[in-house]
């Protein structure tokens, strides 16, 4: 082994140890804080990625992460986007459980834990499949525990996906309707500028944002005007008592989210495998297969040839929402893309609008293209790069057989983490770490790249789970 190879191995081992330490410091026993200060509770899609990271260390602990989240599932099937930790002091996070007031307003909310009234992208089936992939390679006891967890998780996942396919897509378009930018996971992305601008904000009580206390520069976070709209939309949901049918009829923000919808397609592919492992009835497997087909048709309907990207649609107006963001690569996540469209997506990805931009510190995707007029390199989802989104794009490329391209993306992503630590997001040109530090999902995807499904030996022996 050469000196450079020994150095690289030592650096990777140190990075694995550091990432594992972040998860352990944020570990609350049955769930993991998204971050130690800015995000002290359990977030839904964070927990799915976190479980993928835990799987590299302890499949049983990974399973417990999701088990805790499933215990907060609503009667409707919805997995809430926040599960509140009762031990967190009041005022540490806003809006808190009292602001959401879910237990009083709807019988659908769980009685044993406090949650928010929104959801987030459904990465969870991918996490369960990954936990099983690790457990399958273990001893007999580990395999048995993994199989039992798959069977335990499957009904929760099926109810969750059915909720999204019905209550959130009553038209059967194959595209999920989100009712708040927070549901997208990409809170202040330019994708939402037009529909948010149409929201007329009524009277709001005074409030104090806890998030601004944990960042050095308020420009890294959503603006006061955006936050007013976020809270007004929550108030409108509360007036509707979180009733999905009522919200779908009249809510002032309803958007068909291509990225959320593409993740659901990928999750349904995973769910179909989990259904087989669980000996699920044939009618359930047929339903899941139908959701996959319908979801891919929905992606096709939102293709924008000129930009070479998929676009969201405003469900209230029927208009496409034109924005050059990383969400436009949604069809790659959904899979089943026709060859000409796949080539167009990869051309866009390699172009100066994204990975080919000469100013990028690392060739990882900016959340919003520098070519988009709304690009802001330090503002949350309006420009910074996010390691967790890089992981999703890497995963999609591997699924698509673009192994060499995926390997380059992984290498760039690990170089970024090596330099920036486990930051929430990163300024794409200077490489400055932004947002929260010791972010659990950044540590989790780093672990997966290094010792999980992203390790070169794993890629060489099949697709990552």
Describe the function of each predicted region.
Residues 2-42, 69-111, 174-258, 297-385, ...:
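Extended glycan-interaction surfaces of carbohydrate-active proteins
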Residues 10-19, 58-71, 139-164, 267, ...:
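Extended, well-ordered alpha-helical scaffold segments
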Residues 250-294, 375, 379-404:
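Long, repeat-rich segments with strong aromatic
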Residues 105-137, 392-396:
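Hydrophobic/aromatic-rich effector regions of fungal transcription factors
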Residues 120-194:
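Internal, well-ordered domain-core segments that constitute the primary functional module
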Residues 53, 127-130, 134, 267, ...:
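Core register positions within helices of long alpha-helical scaffolds
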């Amino acid at each position: 082994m050469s000196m450079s190879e020994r150095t690289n191995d030592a650096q990777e081992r140190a990075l694995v140890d550091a990432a594992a330490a972040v998860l352990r410091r944020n570990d609350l026993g049955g769930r993991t804080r998204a971050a130690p200060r800015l995000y002290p509770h359990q977030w839904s899609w964070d927990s799915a990625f976190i479980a993928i990271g835990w799987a590299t260390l302890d499949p049983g602990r990974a399973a417990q992460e999701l088990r805790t989240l499933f215990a907060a599932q609503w009667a409707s099937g919805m997995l809430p986007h926040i599960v509140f930790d009762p031990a967190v002091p009041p005022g540490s996070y806003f809006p808190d459980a009292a602001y959401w007031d879910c237990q009083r307003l709807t019988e659908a909310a769980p009685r044993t834990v406090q949650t928010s009234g929104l959801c987030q992208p459904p990465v969870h089936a991918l996490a369960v499949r990954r936990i099983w992939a690790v457990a399958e390679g273990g001893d007999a006891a580990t395999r048995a525990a993994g199989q039992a967890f798959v069977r335990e998780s499957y009904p929760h996942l099926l109810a969750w996906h059915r909720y999204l396919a019905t209550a959130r897509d009553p038209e059967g378009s194959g595209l999920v309707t989100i009712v708040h930018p927070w549901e997208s996971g990409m809170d202040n992305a330019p994708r939402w500028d037009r529909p948010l601008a149409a929201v007329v904000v009524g009277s709001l009580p005074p409030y104090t944002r806890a998030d601004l206390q944990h960042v050095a520069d308020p420009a890294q976070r959503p603006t006061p005007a955006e936050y007013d709209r976020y809270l007004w939309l929550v108030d409108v949901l509360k007036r509707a008592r979180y009733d999905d049918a009522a919200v779908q009829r009249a809510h002032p923000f309803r958007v068909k989210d291509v990225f959320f919808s593409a993740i659901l397609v990928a999750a349904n592919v995973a769910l179909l495998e989990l259904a087989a492992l669980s000996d699920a009835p044939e009618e359930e497997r047929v339903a899941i297969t139908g959701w996959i087909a319908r979801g891919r048709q929905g992606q096709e309907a939102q293709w924008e040839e000129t930009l070479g990207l998929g676009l969201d649609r405003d469900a209230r107006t029927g208009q496409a929402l034109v924005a050059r963001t990383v969400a436009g690569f949604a069809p790659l996540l959904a899979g089943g893309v026709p060859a000409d469209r796949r080539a167009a997506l990869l051309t866009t990805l390699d172009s100066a609008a994204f990975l080919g931009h000469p100013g990028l510190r690392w060739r990882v995707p900016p959340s919003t293209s520098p070519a988009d007029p709304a690009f802001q390199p330090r503002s949350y989802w309006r420009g910074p790069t996010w390691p967790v989104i890089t992981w999703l794009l890497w995963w999609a490329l591997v699924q698509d057989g673009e192994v060499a391209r995926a390997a380059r993306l992984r290498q760039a992503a690990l170089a970024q983490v090596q330099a920036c630590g486990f930051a929430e997001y990163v300024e794409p040109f200077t490489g400055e770490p932004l947002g929260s530090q010791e972010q659990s999902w950044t540590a989790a995807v780093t672990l997966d790249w290094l010792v999980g499904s992203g390790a070169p030996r794993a890629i060489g022996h099949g697709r990552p789970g």
